[in-house]
Structures are given as structure tokens and as C-alpha cells.
Swiss-Prot record:
This is Myosin-12. InterPro entries: Dilute_dom (IPR002710), IQ_motif_EF-hand-BS (IPR000048), Kinesin_motor_dom_sf (IPR036961), Myosin_head_motor_dom-like (IPR001609), Myosin_N (IPR004009), MyosinXI_CBD (IPR037975), MYSc_Myo11 (IPR036018), P-loop_NTPase (IPR027417). Homodimer. Myosin heavy chain that is required for the cell cycle-regulated transport of various organelles and proteins for their segregation. Functions by binding with its tail domain to receptor proteins on organelles and exerting force with its N-terminal motor domain against actin filaments, thereby transporting its cargo along polarized actin cables. Together with XI-K, required for the regulation of organ bending, such as gravitropic root bending. Keywords: Actin-binding, ATP-binding, Calmodulin-binding, Coiled coil, Motor protein, Myosin, Nucleotide-binding, Repeat. It comes from Arabidopsis thaliana.
Length: 1556
């Protein structure tokens, strides 16, 4: 494995340990060839230097992704690396291009999600973290690019996860080469669903695995030219037939037996099965159930999988009937018969099971019994029937059971292959080999020999491939490798399969002799292979032998070799089953050809297996192989347990260590020049300045005295042990440098201490001098203070005497001033009292004069009021004389009331007459309708006949231009006449209504005094309302007649040439119907404006006039020719206007006051022309087609931004104007229902928006916010047009977003990893190189990040130039920044080399560039998206944070990475490595806490993926678009149309001045 190296004191090494296989330790003493080592667990051991291996102390604590990067490639290094990665749930590791997969024994769904597949799609091998998807993608890409078939070889022992790995590989290949769901049930689906079927009949529970494959499987997936799966085939190898009859405890038989026993009661009754404990083939073990497996559910799932792979229900029943027959066959027991060496059925129970088996197989019971108890020997003289003893009969029974099951399994495989189908035109294929691993048990039999032969073959193929890869690298680096050799295992293969002389050849020879036994066979082998280095005989063994395989010695027992090797069907069994009434069973045993039956050539399992194996190897030799080695970490099948001995044994059996041996035979250590110099630059202090890296590497090796190393073009290749020698010398140099540093530090510390003491002494002297100076100064201060005190005391005494004298004088002055103030106050009081007395007296005199004046005024007023009252009395007396006139008016009113009562009675009688007339008219109309329908059917039949006649006439005669007659002009004239009469009638109604209003107003004034008359007037108003409703009914009848007339006009045409005329007539009828609708609305509006209290005066006249109008409308037909001509010219003008509008939509690409002029013109025109209310029009389709043709295939962001603004503006205008139509016809409703599923999300936005619009929303140019009266009642075409607009807004937005993503995606791939700096050439160049490297790194980093910023800036500019709504722009940048966050974050978590401190600083600098751009931009749309980068920002913050080992989980989760989930923090924490300062990552306690939390989540089925998903949805709705426009000024009154429209009179409505 490795060459012994020189071990020095203090070296860290690996030493063998009986419990842990290998354990690390430190060398404390060396004596001769032995070394004393203190291990990691504290023990002291003595080991030979040749048996220990150096340990790389600088290896990352989380291990390396590729073990070829290990400094020491040996067993303990490989084992430790796998252990470290397994502890972090990193189950995949590379060894070159070999993938090692360690079974975690727990669900890790995040590793196999579709998003994870997307990450590995197209990624270079080794670019991302190790994964089986990377192997599958590499094989797929190689097949596509090199047009060469590939193969993926999955191996490992039972329980290592081969089956699941194979499933995931096939799932990824189906993901890469699968077809769309619309192409029906795909091949890849059938291949994937074949796994449960094959597992049911080919897998069983063993000691090591609950779902062990007991057969080999090679799946060939075929691909066409496009790389899509076009076919597949499944090849199986060596089914373990003996398991059908013999099962050891605690294993189980094949799953299908237990599934059938757990089937539903009706199924179990049909197949006559029950408890598995009652069957001999199942009760040989105590294990009947598997934990966490429901056999009943598995049975149903297997039946469902059979349906998918093409096995019909009848065939399924036949299959399980055969399975049940095998179970019953095992319960048939025998005892000695009456004759010698004969046998018979033991009891009635055996008879029952025999009958049941015969019934299930549909064969003869007696014939089955004879085939089990007797044997027919064919001789030249005739057939001889020989009875069998009970033991032979039981063996014969077991042989029948094994043969039937083997044939059944082969039929299932063939059926699956035929159902899937193979592509004979396939250009290439990818084969996935799921083969049993190397096996070595306590008792090994014939199956283990075949399995191990397969592994020897595959190992030889593997060794050749590994050696080939090594040779290719040597050739690529142009080094001499001719003397590199590797050990081959051809001698073992010759020992087993060589013909003649091999073990299988001897076995076939022994099987052809009837008297051969396993003892004679074993003796033959002992004699033949005596002295063979790969063959040995165990001591005291009679039938055992040992073969030295590449993975170790295996001892086989030859006791059952002869029976297991025989591959022939007993003639009686063949005849029995061939005669079965069940076609399925008979087809399992087809009759042998006559010539084949006459041949006596021997056929054996071993020979057939060799042929299959040889065919497999030939297939593999034509493909490019890829290897996956599955490893089972422990024998208890539990997560989190890594057993070193178990794993090490599997690495040996899987050939991984053999690959390492091959690598060690050449140059196991390969390092790039810069990496080599980084590690050993301190050994090159005397390298001349200016030397290149290659020369520097050679100088280091020569200086160290290395022999046999090679210098390639980009790497240096070291022999085994030379890396350790360099590390030892490096350790010495570092130790010397350490001593030098320590000496210098001690000198520095001593001198620092001396200087400190010196400074302290000087400081103390300074303090003492300062103290003496302060004392002298204090004495001087005291003397000065004494003088100051004396001065102040003298001043105090003088001030005290002066203060006493001043106080006495002040007292005397106070008394004098007080006496003077009292005298002044007394004088003021007397003066004030006198003034008050004078004021009161004067007030009294004035009051008396006022009272006298008031009394005189009241007397004068009384006299005047009496005069006025007398005058009023005189007027009242004159009014009393007019009482007689009032009485006369009262009499007139009473007469008028009587007249109105008479009219009411008359009107009731007329109403009854009208009801009778109405009933007769309805019956008459029903008869007319029936006659018209019959005429319509006859007209359609005539049209069909005329079409055929016209075709015949066209073929037989030259074209003749004929005048097209109008067959039913009278009816069209009648239709137009009725419409005109209705218009006249409505005009007269309006006049009458005005007259009624005048009369009712006068009558209302006259009847105010009478409450009774008012109530009568109200009742009359109600009756008049009923009359109006009858008018509506008559109008509806007229519309029905119009509909009938239109159908008759359409049916009247009798020639093919009249189809165009009919279409025009349809349009004209539609126009007339719209006019009817307008008249209806006018009638309703007139009704609403007429007060109900004013309409009863002339209701009788109105009804009579309306009846008169109806009679006249039926008698005055009009000529429709002039009307149709006038309408035709109108249609041409409309078409021309439509063309101008479409031209305007295309050419009017400008914005007026940040508004799309084209959108406004289109909206205004559609509104003015009333096209939103049209039942049919093609202008909407033309607009949609124009938008679609303009954006499809468009790659210009500016162009897309323009159409995004135009379509969103038009969508908003429609959203603010249109409302649902409640009167759409049934056809429109049907059409709407057909589109409900396509635009279901948009229909909600069709309700009238509350958002206002300061523009024209009516037909007369009114402006302002549309209310319920101004909202346009849209028909179905307008509704569909709005839905199309919404769809194209979303599509255009998605195109801009995806284009920007596509542009920045390659830049993100370059930005995720910091540019690798140029390494220092020599030690003296280190300082200069670091400076230059820093500058180059900064310059390189700015380029890629600045390119991203430029792309964002350009997109923002285009959006601003075209005035895209700010909401849409903001959503766009939110999604783009979210995409940047997802891509950078996922790439960071999938690449360990990116999770470093220097790379974190590089990403931090790049993110700072994005942040600066967001802050500098004036648009608000670029400020908020910065929050979308929170995942990558927090991940970068974690990478660049210091002292990670001291941080707790709570601190990390709440302060550093609050947004990241526990799996994400765990992933980045375990992948982190410090390439700048050499510090450690998170503490083991934090790692264990996170692992515990993730384990709990996994148990709760909530284990999330650590990767982020890309959001590709449309992040806004129609309401959001409306809200975005509502936030600004949407007034369209100031938009200036183009000169082209100014010249056209039909667009003058665009220039109308809006009312104030």
C-alpha cells in the first residue's frame, strides 16, 4: 500500500488497532526499527516503523472530496477521510473518477430532488460536490459528445445500497433523456416500474440486507440521435435457485411468496394460500416479516407495477398461480413404498397439497405423482421405469420447484423486455450494472463461487481501467512510465474458468458421471491444483477448498456443487408441464426440438453462467466504464455508525484499495507546481531568482535527494513515500524555524523587560523630584494664605460696624415713609365716594325720562294696529262673497272623478279583450314558426343540392357570371320597416310623455286639497306601468320575428356564389339587432325619467297609439336595397379605419407625458366605435396577432419593453372601463366556459375595478373616473381580448426576465469562485507576489461583477426609456436578484473549494458592487431587490466571520444566519475551510447539535433540502397592473395623436375637447 518512510520524533502517524483497524498517534520514542507511539485514546503502543503510516496533520477536518488529493494515499488515510465525511452526512466521495457511496441508512431526499438534478445537469465532473448524478451526467455527456456507449458499474456487498443507487441512476438518465408526458407512457417509466416487479421475484431478506438482490442485473438504456431514450433491455444473471427450497435462519425466501400469503382474502382463497408458517419452503426459518414492510401493500403495488410494464391481468393470475403451486409442492412429503427403493405420498395432507399443486398448474394429478416418485430411463431396448426412494423423490420435487421458479423468473424478464421494446436503430446506450458484491460467509457454496468469479472478472476490468487512466495521465503529462507495473488477477480467473483444467470444467466433468460425488470432486481438485499459489486445502477438510481472491481467502464447501451445477429438466417434468391445460404454464416448458432431444450434450449452470459473464464482459469492453462502489458502514443497518473494520474489508472487496495499490505502483502523489511550492517553498531558499515553477520543484526534489520522481507539464509526480520524506524535511525546517523564532521572541521579551525596568527607574526618580518641588511650593502657598486671611479678618470687622449703623438709619426712614403713605390713602377714599354718589344720581334722572318716552310710543302703536285690522276685516268680508264660485269648482271635480271611474271600467274590459287577442296571436305565431322551421330545413337541403349542382356545372361548363337575385327582399323590407316604425313610435312616445308631464303637473296642482284623488292618481300610475311592460312584451315579440326573418333570409340563398352575399346580410341583420337593442335602452331610459305620479292621465291614448303603430308596421314594407348599399359603404369605411388603427399601433412608437400613445389611440378608437359591445369583430384578433408577431422570437430588450408597456397600458384601460355583460347570448356563454380553464386566474380581474381613469369612458367624450353608469358592458370578444392582453403581458415579462437571467448566468458561474492567484516562484518573491496578487485579484474581480452590473443597468435603462410601470420593473429585479441569490448560494453549497475565507471575501466584494449599484440607482425598483440576496449575504458573512469555534448554535442561527435553515448552516459549516489564516470552523458541539436537529426532522418526515428553488412564476396579477397605473397621473386628455390621424375625419373624436 505504501513504502515505509523515515519517522522522526513528534511525527503524527497511523498505527494498527485491533478494535478500530487504524488509530492516530504521536511518536514519542524511536529505538532501532521500533517506535513508541501514544495513541489518540491515551494508550502507548510499540510498533515497527515499517507497519506505520504518516498522518497528514494539515488535512481538512471535513475530509477531501477526491481522495487522490490526499497527501498520503494509504489505507488509514482513505478510511479516515471516509469516516470524517460520513460523520457530516457526506456519503459520496471520489477516488479519481471512481465514486464511493456510503449507505447512510436514513432518508436524505434533498440529495435526489429534481432541483439537485438541475444543478448537476451539464456540470463538469468534479466541479460540484461528489454525487452519483455527476457520474450519470458524465456518462450521458460522453455518450452524446463522443458517440460512444457508456456503462456504469455499481457494486458492493448486500445492504450497501446498490439497488437504490441503481434506481437513482436510472431516474437521472430518465430525467436527462426522458420524453414529454404528451408522448404517452415512456420507456423510462416502464424501466423504472420494472424494479418493483423484479425485486418481488428476485429479492429476499438476508442476514445483511432486508432487500437483497439474489440475481445480477444489467440494464441497457438505448438513446436515439437526439439523446432521448428510445429503448431498453434488462439482462439478468444467476438467479439463486436454491433459495426456493432451502432458507437458513434468520433469512427469508423470495418476497413474492410472502406477498401472496398476505394478499386480500379473495385472492388468497383463489390461490389457496394462507399463513406462511404452514408451508415447508417458508417455515424453515423463524423470520416471516420484515420491519417497516407491509407485504399486503407490497402485493398490491407489485400488481400495479405489472400493469405498467405490460403484464396483463390474466398473465398476473397465472404467475401467482404458479407461485402458489410451488408453495403447495413443497408440502408434498414421501415415505417408503411397498417395493424396494420406492416411495409414495406420506399421508392425506401430502395428497391434498399434490392435488392443489396439480390444480393450480392445470396438469394431471396422477402424472405429477408419477413424475415425482418414478424416473424413466431410456435404453436402446426400450424405456425402463425406475422407482425413486423417498430422499430422491424429495430431491426430485425440489428440482421441479426450482426449475419452475427459474423459468417463471426468466419469463417475467423476457416479458418486461418485450413490453419495453428495444430500438434497433439506437446510436448508443448506457448500461447500468447492479451486480452482487464479493461474498464470504461461514459456509460458501456454488453460488458464492460464481459470484466471486464475476467480481474477479469485474475487478480485472476495473484494474485495467484504473491503470489505463493512470497511463493516460502519464502520457498527457509526458513522463516516462514504461516501468510501471500492476498486479493482475488472471491466474485466479484461469483457476476457476479455464477450459480445460479449471474448477468449473472439473465440476462439469464430475456432473456427467452418475457415480460422482462431492468427495470425488473435491479429491480431483486437490490432485489437480496441488501447489497452485491461489488454491489451498484447509486442514482436516474432506470436501472444502480455499481460493485466494483479490479480496482475500474464501473457503468453499463442495458438498452441493454437483446438484447446483446441473441445468437440465427431467423429461417427466417436461412432459407433465408441457401437457398443462394452462397455456401460460405450457409456454414455460415448450417442447424441445426433435434433434435437440436426441442430443446427449451436457448442460450446466456453471457453463451457462460463464457464457453470460463472457457476453457481459464483451459488452462492457465496448463501452466506456464508470464505477460506483457502494459501502455498508455497519452491520446493524443503523444511521450514524461507522465500523472501521467492516468498511475496510468492503474497500478491499470492492477493489478500491486495489486501485490505490495500482496508483501506488506508479506515482500515487500528483501535485500541481503551485500547490507543491505552496507546501514546500521553505525548502527552496537557495533557488536562483527568476527560476520558473518547474525548475523550482526540480531543485527542491534534487536538494532533498529524491530518486525516481517525474516532472510533468503541469504536475510533479512522486513515488510512494517521497511525500512523507518531503514532509519530514519540511517538519525539520519548520522545527528549526520554530526554534529560531522562539529564540528571537525570548530575546525580544528579555530586552523588553530590561527596557521596562529602565523606564520604571527613570519614572520613579521623576516622581521623587516632583514630590520635593510640590512640598516647597506648598510652604510658599501657606505663607501667602496667612497674609490673605489677616487681610480678610480686618475687612470683616470694618464691614460689620458699617452694617449696624446702616440698619439703624433704615428703621427711622421706614417709619416716616409709612406715616406719609397712610395720609395719602385716606384722601383717595373720600374722593372716590363722592364720585360714586354723583354718578348714581345722574343715572336716576335719565331712567325716569326713558320711561315716559316708552309709554307714549306704545299708545301710538296701538292706534296704528287697530287701523290695519279694520282694513283686513273689510277684505275678508269681500272674500266671503266668492263662496258660491268654490262650490261650483267642487261640483266639477266630482264629475271628473266619475268620468275617471268610467274610464277605468272601460279599460278593464279592453284589457280582457287584448288578452284573448294575445292568446290567439301567440297560437298563430307558433304555427308560423313551425312552418318557417320546415321551410328553413327545406332551404338548407336545397342549398346542399344546389352546391352539388354548382360544382358539377363548374366542372362541365365555362364560368358564367350571373346576377345574384335577392330571394326574400320582402321580408328584409318588412324588417327594416318595423325598425323604422319603432323609431317613430319611440319619438311619439317621448312627445306624449312630455304632454303627460304637463297635464299631470296641472292636475296635481288642482288635486292637492283632495287626498282621495291623490291615491287614485297613484293607482293609475301603477296601471300605466303595467301598460309600459306590455309595450316591452310587444317589442320582444318584434325582436323574435326579426330573428326568424334573419334565419329565413339566410336560408333563401340557393347557389354557391351567394355565400358572400349571405355573410354580408348576416352583418346587416346584426346591425339591425344592435339598433333594436339601442331602441330598447332608450325606451327603458324614457321610462325611468317619467315620474310615476304623472302618467295616468293619457294611458289609454298611449296604448291605442301603440297598437296603431303595430298595425301600420305590418302594412308598410320598405325597400332594403338602399339601406344595404349604405351599410356596405359604411363597412368599407370601418375596414379602412381599422387598417389605419393597426398602422398606428405599429408606427406610433412614442410616449407623451410617459404614456403610450399607441395604447391610448387604440383604446379611444375601440371605445368610440363601440367595439367592446359588439358580438363579433375581428379587430381584437388583429391587435393580438400584431402583439404576438412583434414579441415572438424577439431578442431585443428595448423592443420587448415597449410592447410590455403598450400591452399593460391597454390592459389597464380595459380593466378600468369594461364590466361583465349579463345579457350575452348562449353561444357567448358557451365560448366563455370553454376558455375558463385557460384564463381562470385572469377572470377574477374582469370585475369593474375601483381604480379611476381620467379619460373618456362614454361615447360623448366625457372625462373622469367611470362610475357604474359609465362602465361599458363588454361582450365576449372584448372579454377574450382582455384575457389575451393579460397573457401577453405575462409572456413579455417572462421573456425579458429569462433573457436577463440567460445573460448573467455564465457570469455568475465565473463570480462564484475567486480567481486563483499566481504563486510565488521563490521564497524571496513572496512579498512582491502577494502585492501583485492582491492587485490582480481586485482587477479580475471587478470585471465579472461589473459585467453583471452593466447587464442590470442596461435592462433598467430600457425599462425606463419605455416607461414600463414601476411595479413591473420592481418585480422583475426582485426575481432577477432572487435568481442571483439562488445560483450563488447553491453553487457555494455544492463546491467545497468555494467555502473558504478568501472566497468569502471575494464574494463580499462582489456583493458590495451590487449593493452600490442598488443604492446609486434613482429608480426605487432597484433598491428593495437588495433584500432578495439575504441567503448569499448571510452565507458570506458566515465565511468571513472570525472565531467560529467560539460561537454557539443560537448565536449563529439568530445573529449571523437568521434566514438560513439548519441543514443550510450545517452544510456550509461542514464544508468551510480557512485557506487564509488556518483557523478551524465550527466546534464539534455545534455540529452535533445541528446533526441532532436534522435527525429529528428526518424522523418527522420534514427534512428540507439545503438548496434553494428558482421562482419562475409571474409575480403580479391584473389588479396589480391596475394599481401600478393608479399610483400616477393617468389622464389621457393631454396626449397628442400623430399628424396621420389629424388628416382623417373618422379619427376627429381624438381631438374633441373634453368638458370641464
Amino acid at each position: 500500500m505504501g513504502t515505509p518512510v523515515n519517522i522522526t520524533l513528534g511525527s503524527h502517524v497511523w498505527v494498527e488497532d485491533p478494535e478500530l483497524a487504524w488509530i492516530s498517534g504521536e511518536v514519542t520514542e524511536i529505538k532501532g526499527t521500533n517506535a513508541k507511539i501514544v495513541t489518540a485514546n491515551g494508550k502507548t503502543v510499540v510498533a515497527s516503523i515499517s507497519s506505520i503510516y504518516p498522518k497528514d496533520t494539515e488535512a481538512p477536518p471535513a475530509g477531501v472530496d477526491d481522495m487522490t488529493k490526499l497527501a498520503y494515499l494509504h489505507e488509514p488515510g482513505v478510511l479516515h477521510n471516509l469516516d470524517c465525511r460520513f460523520a457530516l452526512n457526506e456519503i459520496y466521495t471520489y477516488t479519481g473518477n471512481i465514486l464511493i457511496a456510503v449507505n447512510p441508512f436514513q432518508r436524505l431526499p434533498h440529495l435526489y430532488s429534481v432541483h439537485m438534478m438541475e444543478q448537476y445537469k451539464g456540470a463538469a465532473f468534479g466541479e460540484l460536490s461528489p454525487h452519483l448524478f455527476a457520474v450519470a451526467d458524465t456518462s450521458y455527456r460522453a455518450m452524446i459528445n463522443e458517440a460512444r456507449s457508456q456503462s456504469i458499474l455499481v457494486s458492493g456487498e448486500s445492504g450497501a445500497g446498490k439497488t437504490e443507487t441503481t434506481k437513482m441512476l436510472m431516474r437521472y438518465l430518465a430525467f436527462m433523456g426522458g420524453r414529454s408526458d404528451t408522448e404517452g407512457r415512456s420507456v423510462e417509466q416502464q424501466v423504472l416500474e420494472s424494479n418493483p416487479v423484479l425485486e418481488a421475484f428476485g429479492n429476499a431478506k438476508t442476514v445483511k440486507n432486508n432487500n437483497s438482490s439474489r440475481f445480477g442485473k444489467f440494464v441497457e438504456i438505448q438513446f436515439d440521435k437526439r439523446g432521448k431514450i428510445s429503448g431498453a433491455a434488462i439482462r439478468t444473471y444467476l438467479l439463486e435457485r436454491s433459495r426456493v427450497c432451502q432458507v437458513s435462519d434468520p433469512e427469508r425466501n423470495y418476497h413474492c411468496f410472502y406477498m401472496l400469503c398476505a394478499a386480500p382474502p379473495e385472492e388468497a382463497k383463489k390461490f389457496k394460500v394462507g399463513d406462511p408458517r404452514t408451508f415447508h419452503y417458508l417455515n424453515q426459518t423463524n423470520c416471516y416479516e420484515v420491519s417497516n414492510v407491509d407485504d399486503a401493500r407490497e402485493y398490491l403495488e407489485t400488481r400495479n407495477a405489472m400493469d405498467i410494464v405490460g403484464i396483463g391481468q390474466e398473465a398476473q393470475d397465472a404467475i401467482f398461480r404458479v407461485v402458489a403451486a410451488i408453495l403447495h409442492l413443497g408440502n408434498v412429503n414421501f415415505i417408503k413404498g411397498e417395493e424396494a427403493d420406492s416411495s409414495k405420498l406420506r399421508d392425506d395432507k401430502s395428497r391434498y397439497h399434490l392435488q392443489t399443486a396439480a390444480e393450480l398448474l392445470m396438469c394431471n394429478e396422477k402424472m405429477m405423482e408419477d413424475s415425482l416418485c418414478k424416473r424413466v430411463i431410456v435404453t436402446p431396448d426400450g424405456n425402463i421405469t425406475k422407482p425413486l426412494d423417498p430422499e430422491s423423490a424429495a430431491s426430485n420435487r425440489d428440482a421441479l420447484a426450482k426449475t419452475v421458479y427459474s423459468r417463471l423468473f426468466d419469463w417475467i424478464v423476457d416479458k418486461i423486455n418485450s413490453s419495453i421494446g428495444q430500438d434497433p436503430d439506437a446510436k448508443s446506450l448506457i448500461g447500468v450494472l447492479d451486480i452482487y458484491g464479493f461474498e464470504s460467509f461461514k459456509i460458501n457454496s456454488f453460488e458464492q463461487l460464481c459470484i466471486n468469479l464475476t467480481n474477479e472478472k469485474l475487478q480485472q476490468h476495473f484494474n485495467q481501467h484504473v491503470f489505463k487512466m493512470e497511463q493516460e495521465e502519464y502520457t498527457r503529462e509526458e513522463i516516462n512510465w514504461s516501468y510501471v507495473e500492476f498486479v493482475d488477477n488472471q491466474d485466479v480467473l484461469d483457476l476457476i474458468e479455464k477450459k480445460p483444467g479449471g474448477i468449473i470444467a472439473l465440476l462439469d466433468e464430475a456432473c456427467m458421471f452418475p457415480k460422482s460425488t462431492h468427495e470425488t470432486f473435491a479429491q480431483k481438485m486437490y490432485q489437480t491444483y496441488k501447489g497452485h499459489k491461489r488454491f489451498s486445502k484447509p486442514k482436516l477438510a474432506q470436501t472444502a477448498f480455499t481460493v485466494n481472491h483479490y479480496a482475500g481467502d474464501v473457503t468453499y464447501s463442495a458438498e452441493q456443487f454437483l446438484d447446483k451445477n446441473k441445468d437440465y429438466v427431467v423429461a417427466e417434468h417436461q412432459a407433465l408441464l408441457d401437457a398443462s391445460k394452462c397455456s401460460f404454464v405450457a409456454n414455460l416448458f415448450p417442447p424441445l426440438p426433435e434433434d435437440a432431444s436426441k442430443q446427449s450434450k451436457f448442460s450446466s449452470i456453471g457453463t451457462r453462467f460463464k457464457q453470460q459473464l463472457q457476453a457481459l464482459m464483451e459488452t462492457l469492453n465496448t463501452t466506456e466504464p464508470h464505477y460506483i462502489r457502494c459501502v455498508k458502514p455497519n452491520a446493524v443497518l443503523k444511521p450514524g455508525i461507522f465500523e472501521n473494520d467492516n468498511v475496510l474489508n468492503q474497500l478491499r472487496c470492492g477493489g478500491v484499495l486495489e486501485a490505490i495499490r495500482i496508483s501506488c505502483a506508479g506515482y500515487p502523489t500528483k501535485r500541481a507546481f503551485d500547490e507543491f511550492l505552496d507546501r514546500f517553498v521553505m525548502l527552496a531558499t537557495d533557488v536562483p531568482e527568476g527560476s520558473d515553477e518547474k525548475s523550482a520543484c526540480a531543485s527542491i526534489c534534487n536538494k532533498m535527494g529524491l530518486k525516481g520522481y517525474q516532472i510533468g507539464k503541469t504536475k510533479i509526480f512522486l513515488r510512494a513515500g517521497q511525500m512523507a520524506e518531503l514532509d519530514a524535511r519540511r517538519t525539520e525546517v519548520l522545527a528549526g524555524a520554530t526554534k529560531l523564532i522562539q529564540r528571537q521572541i525570548r530575546t525580544y521579551l528579555t530586552r523588553k523587560e530590561f527596557l521596562g525596568q529602565k523606564r520604571a527607574t527613570i519614572y520613579m526618580q521623576k516622581l521623587w523630584r516632583a514630590k520635593l518641588a510640590r512640598k516647597l511650593y506648598q510652604n510658599m502657598r501657606r505663607e501667602a494664605a496667612s497674609i490673605c486671611i489677616q487681610k480678610n479678618i480686618r475687612a470683616h470687622r470694618a464691614r460689620k460696624n458699617y452694617t449696624k449703623l446702616q440698619a439703624s438709619a433704615t428703621v427711622i426712614q421706614t417709619g416716616l415713609r409709612t406715616m406719609s403713605a397712610r395720609n395719602k390713602h385716606r384722601h383717595r377714599r373720600r374722593t372716590k365716594a363722592a364720585i360714586i354718589i354723583q354718578r348714581e344720581w345722574r343715572r336716576h334722572q335719565v331712567h325716569e325720562a326713558y320711561k315716559k318716552h316708552k309709554k307714549a310710543t306704545l299708545a301710538l302703536q296701538c292706534l296704528w294696529r287697530a287701523k290695519v285690522a279694520r282694513k283686513e276685516l273689510k277684505n275678508l268680508r269681500m272674500a266671503a262673497r266668492e263662496t258660491g264660485a268654490l262650490k261650483e269648482a267642487k261640483d266639477k271635480l266630482e264629475k271628473r272623478v266619475e268620468e275617471l271611474t268610467w274610464r277605468l271600467e272601460l279599460e278593464k274590459n279592453q284589457k280582457a279583450d287584448l288578452e284573448d287577442a294575445k292568446a290567439q296571436e301567440i297560437a298563430k305565431l307558433q304555427n308560423n314558426l313551425t312552418e318557417l322551421q320546415e321551410k328553413l330545413d327545406e332551404a338548407y337541403a336545397a342549398i346542399i343540392r344546389d352546391k352539388e349542382a354548382a360544382k358539377l356545372a363548374i366542372e362541365q361548363a365555362p364560368p358564367i357570371i350571373k346576377e345574384v337575385p335577392v330571394v326574400d327582399n320582402t321580408q328584409l323590407e318588412l324588417l327594416n320597416s318595423q325598425n323604422n316604425e319603432l323609431e317613430v313610435e319611440v319619438a311619439k312616445l317621448k312627445g306624449k310623455i312630455k304632454e303627460f308631464e304637463v297635464k299631470c303637473f296641472a292636475l296635481e296642482n288642482d288635486s292637492r286639497a283632495s287626498v282621495t284623488e291623490a291615491e287614485d292618481a297613484k293607482s293609475k300610475a301603477v296601471e300605466f306601468q303595467e301598460i309600459i311592460e306590455r309595450l316591452h312584451t310587444n317589442l320582444s315579440n318584434l325582436e323574435s320575428e326579426n330573428q326568424v326573418l334573419r334565419q329565413q333570409a339566410l336560408a333563401a340563398s340557393t347557389s354557391v356564389e351567394e355565400i358572400g352575399e349571405l355573410n354580408s346580410l348576416k352583418d346587416k341583420v346584426a346591425i339591425l339587432e344592435s339598433e333594436n337593442e339601442t331602441l330598447r335602452r332608450q325606451t327603458e331610459s324614457a321610462e325611468k325619467t317619467m315620474p310615476p305620479a304623472r302618467v295616468f292621465a293619457s294611458e289609454k291614448n298611449l296604448e291605442n297609439e301603440h297598437q296603431t303603430k303595430e298595425i301600420q308596421a305590418t302594412k308598410e314594407p320598405r325597400n332594403p336595397i338602399n339601406v344595404l348599399a349604405k351599410q356596405g359603404s359604411l363597412t368599407d369605411r370601418q375596414q379602412e379605419s381599422h387598417e389605419v388603427l393597426m398602422k398606428c399601433l405599429t408606427d406610433e412608437r412614442r410616449f407623451d407625458n410617459e404614456k403610450s400613445v399607441a395604447a391610448w389611440i387604440v383604446y379611444k378608437a375601440l371605445l368610440q366605435w363601440r367595439l367592446f359591445e359588439a358580438e363579433k369583430t375581428n379587430i381584437f384578433d388583429r391587435i393580438v396577432h400584431k402583439i404576438r408577431s412583434s414579441i415572438e422570437g424577439q431578442d431585443d430588450t428595448r423592443e420587448l419593453a415597449y410592447w410590455l408597456t403598450t400591452s399593460s397600458t391597454l390592459l389597464y384601460l380595459l380593466q378600468s372601463t369594461l364590466k361583465f355583460s349579463n345579457t350575452n347570448n348562449a353561444a357567448s356563454r358557451r365560448n366563455r366556459s370553454s376558455h375558463a380553464t385557460l384564463f381562470g386566474r385572469l377572470v377574477q380581474g374582469m370585475q369593474p375595478s375601483s381604480v379611476g381613469l381620467e379619460t373618456s369612458s362614454g361615447y360623448s367624450g366625457m372625462a373622469g373616473i367611470p362610475n357604474d353608469q359609465q362602465m361599458v358592458e363588454a361582450k365576449y370578444p372584448a372579454l377574450l381580448f382582455k384575457q389575451h392582453l393579460a397573457a401577453y403581458v405575462e409572456k413579455t415579462y417572462g421573456m425579458i426576465r429569462d433573457k436577463l437571467k440567460k445573460e448573467i448566468n455564465p457570469l455568475l458561474n465565473l463570480c462564484i469562485h475567486a480567481p486563483r492567484p499566481t504563486r510565488a516562484k521563490t521564497l524571496r518573491d513572496v512579498t512582491k507576489s502577494i502585492h501583485l496578487t492582491t492587485i490582480a485579484k481586485q482587477q479580475a474581480s471587478y470585471v465579472q461583477w461589473q459585467n453583471i452590473v452593466n447587464k442590470l443597468e442596461h435592462t433598467l435603462t430600457f425599462m425606463a426609456e419605455n416607461h414600463v410601470p414601476s411595479m413591473i420593473t420592481r418585480k422583475l429585479f426582485h426575481q432577477v436578484f432572487s435568481y442571483i441569490n439562488v445560483q450563488l448560494f447553491n453553487s457555494l453549497l455544492l463546491r467545497r473549494e468555494c467555502c473558504s475565507v478568501s472566497n468569502g471575501e471575494y464574494l463580499k466584494m462582489g456583493l458590495h458592487e451590487l449593493e452600490q449599484w442598488c443604492l446609486k440607482a434613482d429608480d426605487e425598483a432597484t433598491r428593495s431587490p437588495w433584500d432578495e440576496l439575504q441567503h448569499i449575504r448571510q452565507a458570506v458573512m458566515f465565511l468571513v466571520s472570525h472565531q467560529k469555534t467560539q460561537k454557539s448554535l443560537d448565536e449563529i442561527a439568530k445573529e449571523i444566519c437568521p434566514v438560513l435553515s439548519i441543514p443550510q448552516v450545517y452544510r456550509i459549516g461542514t464544508m468551510f475551510w480557512d485557506d487564509k489564516y488556518g483557523t478551524q470552523g465550527l466546534s464539534p458541539e455545534v455540529i452535533n447539535q445541528m446533526r441532532k436537529l436534522m435527525t429529528e426532522d428526518s424522523a418527522n418526515m420534514t427534512y428540507p433540502s439545503f438548496l434553494l428553488d428558482v421562482d419562475s412564476s409571474i409575480p403580479f396579477s391584473v389588479e396589480d397592473v391596475s394599481q401600478s397605473f393608479h399610483g400616477g397621473n393617468i389622464s389621457l386628455s393631454d396626449v397628442d395623436p400623430s399628424p396621420l390621424l389629424r388628416q382623417r375625419s373618422d379619427f376627429h373624436f381624438l381631438f374633441q375637447t373634453l368638458p370641464e
